[in-house]
Amino acid sequence: MLLEGHQGDIFSLEFHPEGQYLASTGFDRQIFIWNVYGECENISVLTGHSGAIMELHFSPDGNHLYTASTDMTLGLWDIAAGTRIKKLKGHTSFVNSVSGARRGLTQLCSGSDDSTIRVWDPRKRGQCYTLNNTYQVTAVTFNDTAEQVISGGIDNDIKVWDLRKNSILYKLKGHSDTITGLSLSPDGSYILSNAVDNTLRIWDVRPFAPYERCVKIISGHQHNFEKNLLRCAWSPDGSKVSAGSSDRFHYIWDTTSRRILYKLPGHNGSVNDIDFHPKEPIVCSGSSDKQIYLGEIETVQ
């Protein structure tokens, strides 16, 4: 199923936690909400950012959306009302990434070209913490308990920050180019990273993991001169991983064997973001060709 309507590159998309909706956004500064079933019609458009939206995520309960934009702000959106309820200011350059806490109180973390990571409590006016990184930050995510923020940037290292001490707990070294996407596994034990060195890596982020935390290196997809922030994702059961690719294909691998299970064609531009449906064998991809594909994959027993 092809979903059309965006006027520019699509940078980010995600299924609703219950699976009935899909949200997408990108260069045109608009957030589209689509029905996943039936005719897949566009049911609402949210506007308010004055710059490209680099990343969006649903809140765990599915009632809100979080967005990061090149207008240097984060947005917190009420999906039912179709309005932005909070505009979080503080970054001094493009915001490349946003992530929400999986459980507990609503917290957001963000990463920016201003070389900071910020952790926000949207119920309070200002941000909670600022973590100073030396280089631009391109991807962030919380760990499972939201006591740590995991960040990636143009210095090739993934950093795990302890929010109680405001310091780096440890670094995950191995990528040889910019980190473009980070995704925490469904069980919270592993982090998936996508980088311009044309590899995906899986890292063990459990507290007492062995010293060598890189457990898998996966390849097959491509990055190119466009330097888009190609994201990555886990299937709900953790058995598959997927990544954006500049060669116009949507790749899905088996997590254990690292084998390419699917190389899905159709796009005419870089595939920037992908997602797995939370309940069914459906995947989606968003591309610089302004189009979204929804497709079914077979369930491998």
Q: Language model features by range: what are they?
A:
Residues 1-7, 215:
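A short helix->beta-strand "capping" segment at the edge of beta-propeller domains
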Residues 13-19, 57-62, 99-105, 141-147, ...:
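Loop/turn segments within WD40 beta-propeller blades
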Residues 24-28, 67-71, 110-114, 122, ...:
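Conserved strand-to-loop turn within each blade of WD40 beta-propeller repeats
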Residues 33-55, 59-63, 73-97, 101-107, ...:
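Per-blade loop-tip surfaces of WD-repeat and WD-like beta-propellers in eukaryotic adaptors/scaffolds
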Residues 190-207:
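C-terminal amphipathic alpha-helical segment
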Residues 223-252:
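Loop/turn-rich, solvent-exposed surfaces of beta-rich toroidal or solenoidal domains
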Residues 275-301:
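Blade-level signature of beta-propeller repeat domains, shared across WD40, Kelch, NHL, RCC1
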